[in-house]
Amino acid sequence: MAPFDFRKNKSMSSPDTLQIPTDLLPRDGRFGSGPSKIRGEQITALVADAPTYLGTSHRQATVRSKVGEVRDGLSALFNLPEGYEVLLGNGGTTCFWDAATFHLIAEQSQHLSFGEFSSKFASAAKEAPHIKDPSIITSEVGTHPTAVAEEGVDLYALTHNETSTGVMMPIVRPAGATGLVAVDATSGAGGLMVDANEFDCYYFAPQKSFSSDGGLWLALCSPAAIERIESLAASGRWTPAFFDLKITLDNSRLNQTYNTPALATIHLLASQIKWMNENGGLSFSSGRSRTSAEILYSWAEASDFATPFVTNPADRSNVVGTIDFSDDIDATVIAKVLRANGVVDTDPYRKLGRNQLRVAMFPSIDSEDVASLCACINWIVGNL
């Protein structure tokens, strides 16, 4: 096999033959942006409870108590003010976007669109025939726009962390706005600090910072959001039962889901929330991600072949880091060598189309492993 040219016009070693020294490798090589690394302790806890938990009815006390543990744990983790409630339903964040067009948006929404995922809720609202076309504020990838109060808008849709680009934004109610503030926190929740007083609905899925699996959505809802759900349900607006947030609300108050959930997902989620709360809460979990981010971005800034994709340091995500490489370095080859050596899922988001790596830094990922990843990349570049 001919050598693979890693740097242009130079003879290089084949990436297929490279073995990274074991003393450089991370202890755990999982850096995927979702599904994410699951801690071994979560698996051990699930196995211990499996005989009496798995394969049982989700409407019986065994599972409902675990759902209650999730709801109470999230209330504590996010220090939810009085009157806020935790809702959960099947289908993931994509399902929640559709549900929100029925029972959170009364007439019109405003959306900040600055990447693949932040644009999807805007598309869902635009395609819904029973509400007005949304107002959409965009910015270039690698940046984020700012919400502004707008007449007629009754819901402001923000995104805490744009998973596709590695941009995070502060969650603050738009000045002078009277509508609800709904935040897509799919990859940000649990890994970024947030003040519950700044949102009415903070929704996410558990396969990122919460080290569980997909197919479930959770939403932290203020009294105003609860009132919106109830009033739109009472208005007679037709809603498919799967997207009916009033049905979700009623079932959540009973510590259950409308239809059968994945029990393992709920158990893994409960274990992760417990781990976060027992070690100091959101300041602990977000602190772990912040430390990992400092390591990754400091390495990239000091490198002569890599640089953070997001130019404004304040906008660089603490949970999903995107690192660009110089034109004479092929990031796909780096990812290939890493994978061959057990360091997986560092590939960039496919639709972004950049010569970069994307590194998850969720709370379960040890900061020492992020440092080891950086050392591995240096070794690969030096040996290709």
Sequence positions of predicted segments:
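N-terminal "arm"/small-domain region of PLP-dependent enzymes with the aminotransferase-like
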Residues: 6, 10-57
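PLP-dependent enzyme catalytic core of the Aspartate aminotransferase-like
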Residues: 6-8, 13, 28, 351, ...
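Active-site C-terminal subdomain of aminotransferase-like
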Residues: 37, 207-297
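Conserved N-terminal alpha-helix of the aminotransferase class I/II PLP-enzyme fold
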Residues: 50-99, 116, 120, 124
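PLP-dependent aminotransferase-like
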Residues: 94-154
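Active-site phosphate-binding strand-loop segment of PLP-dependent enzymes
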Residues: 138-190, 201
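Conserved active-site segment immediately N-terminal to the catalytic lysine
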Residues: 196-207, 217
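Conserved PLP-binding catalytic core of the aspartate aminotransferase-like
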Residues: 307-337
